[in-house]
């Protein structure tokens, strides 16, 4: 990979976007960004607080702006928030400005990976987590698929193995 293309990771919560993104950036010697962490850095508050105070719509507005700015950079790996694809503008920008990698996972893996994580505002509701994740998958999976240049299942694989798969796929294209 002579020229460093932007790599944008999309997928549901618990797919491993942040962990795999860090690994990928390290292996490729690229700068890593996480859109949720960038929102937290800019607001001085965690994502849950932003959701509570501004609602999902306010959070999504911030997310769209952050992703727009970050995707204008060159040679980065960006882990996006699971719901960022709800915005048509964001989907268009991701598609136009880099390679989109959809990290796919099962509901079971999502449950296992997110069960103790209190920083998941969409899971801090009265509905059972499985029902929430199934509803989100039904809404968002087609959007991930729509913009994905590459799809990789992350179940039962280490971040390093998935990062290597992504690198191999990018080098062969």
From Swiss-Prot:
<dbReference type="InterPro" id="IPR027417">
    <property type="entry name" value="P-loop_NTPase"/>
</dbReference>
<keyword id="KW-0028">Amino-acid biosynthesis</keyword>
<comment type="function">
    <text>Catalyzes the specific phosphorylation of the 3-hydroxyl group of shikimic acid using ATP as a cosubstrate.</text>
</comment>
<keyword id="KW-0963">Cytoplasm</keyword>
<keyword id="KW-0067">ATP-binding</keyword>
<keyword id="KW-0418">Kinase</keyword>
<dbReference type="GO" id="GO:0005829">
    <property type="term" value="C:cytosol"/>
</dbReference>
<comment type="subunit">
    <text>Monomer.</text>
</comment>
<feature type="binding site">
    <location>
        <position position="36"/>
    </location>
    <ligand>
        <name>substrate</name>
    </ligand>
</feature>
<dbReference type="Pfam" id="PF01202">
    <property type="entry name" value="SKI"/>
</dbReference>
<keyword id="KW-0460">Magnesium</keyword>
<feature type="binding site">
    <location>
        <position position="60"/>
    </location>
    <ligand>
        <name>substrate</name>
    </ligand>
</feature>
<feature type="binding site">
    <location>
        <position position="140"/>
    </location>
    <ligand>
        <name>substrate</name>
    </ligand>
</feature>
<dbReference type="GO" id="GO:0000287">
    <property type="term" value="F:magnesium ion binding"/>
</dbReference>
<comment type="pathway">
    <text>Metabolic intermediate biosynthesis; chorismate biosynthesis; chorismate from D-erythrose 4-phosphate and phosphoenolpyruvate: step 5/7.</text>
</comment>
<dbReference type="InterPro" id="IPR031322">
    <property type="entry name" value="Shikimate/glucono_kinase"/>
</dbReference>
<comment type="similarity">
    <text>Belongs to the shikimate kinase family.</text>
</comment>
<dbReference type="GO" id="GO:0008652">
    <property type="term" value="P:amino acid biosynthetic process"/>
</dbReference>
<dbReference type="GO" id="GO:0005524">
    <property type="term" value="F:ATP binding"/>
</dbReference>
<dbReference type="InterPro" id="IPR023000">
    <property type="entry name" value="Shikimate_kinase_CS"/>
</dbReference>
<dbReference type="GO" id="GO:0009423">
    <property type="term" value="P:chorismate biosynthetic process"/>
</dbReference>
<feature type="binding site">
    <location>
        <position position="18"/>
    </location>
    <ligand>
        <name>Mg(2+)</name>
    </ligand>
</feature>
<keyword id="KW-0057">Aromatic amino acid biosynthesis</keyword>
<keyword id="KW-0479">Metal-binding</keyword>
<dbReference type="GO" id="GO:0009073">
    <property type="term" value="P:aromatic amino acid family biosynthetic process"/>
</dbReference>
<feature type="binding site">
    <location>
        <position position="157"/>
    </location>
    <ligand>
        <name>ATP</name>
    </ligand>
</feature>
<feature type="binding site">
    <location>
        <position position="82"/>
    </location>
    <ligand>
        <name>substrate</name>
    </ligand>
</feature>
<feature type="binding site">
    <location>
        <begin position="14"/>
        <end position="19"/>
    </location>
    <ligand>
        <name>ATP</name>
    </ligand>
</feature>
<keyword id="KW-0808">Transferase</keyword>
<keyword id="KW-0547">Nucleotide-binding</keyword>
<feature type="binding site">
    <location>
        <position position="120"/>
    </location>
    <ligand>
        <name>ATP</name>
    </ligand>
</feature>
<dbReference type="InterPro" id="IPR000623">
    <property type="entry name" value="Shikimate_kinase/TSH1"/>
</dbReference>
<protein>
    <recommendedName>
        <fullName>Shikimate kinase 1</fullName>
        <ecNumber>2.7.1.71</ecNumber>
    </recommendedName>
</protein>
<dbReference type="GO" id="GO:0004765">
    <property type="term" value="F:shikimate kinase activity"/>
</dbReference>
